[in-house]
Amino acid sequence: LRDRPEHMLEISPKGTVPVMLLPNGEVIEESLEIMQYVLNWELNDDETYWIDRNDNEFKYHLDRYKYPNRFENVDFIQQRDLAKRYLDDLDSYLSDSLPTRLSDALFPFVRQFANHDRAWFDAQGWQNLHQWLDNNLVSDEFARCMKKYQQWHAGDEVAIFPTTE
């Protein structure tokens, strides 16, 4: 986000990623909404429950855990412990197979949390969560999604995503 394209800022002044500009000029600025649009995905009750908890509970504590200096009177250990409650529940839920789309929606946030203090994360007794995270990290899909691209400029060749490389 250090070198945001001018066109991106024109269509989405908030300047955060992701941004999807549709042919009709509509702009979609939320990851989940982009996933729903591209995959024609209507959330079921279970998916809604987990995504709501992720967005309204876990991400709140994740931000304060990772960036305590951005907030007043925040104890990052307390925030980590509050986020842990969600992860405890997710670990239990993961004893069943997590639907792929839901997994893809939750994974980036759990990855951020894990990477903030990997030694602490790995020391937790989350057998299912650790296996799920590790499986995602070594997947071909993750490798394709994390491929680095040069910043696109008007006139450049169109990049089709995801690549099949």
Label the model's feature ranges.
Residues L1-R85, D91, L98:
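GST-like domain detector, emphasizing the conserved glutathione-binding G-site
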Residues L39-L43, R70, S95, F109-V110, ...:
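Hydrophobic/aromatic-lined pockets within catalytic cores
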Residues L62, D122, A143-K147:
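Short, hydrophobic secondary-structure boundary micro-motifs
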Residues E72-Q78, A119-Q124, L137:
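Residues lining hydrophobic/aromatic ligand-binding pockets adjacent to catalytic sites
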Residues S92-P99, E141-M146:
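Surface-exposed helix-capping loop/turn segments at secondary-structure junctions
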Residues L98-G125, H130:
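GST superfamily/GST-like fold recognition
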Residues G125-F142:
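C-terminal end-helix/capping segment
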Residues Y149-E165:
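Acidic/histidine-enriched, glycine/proline-rich intrinsically disordered or flexible terminal extensions
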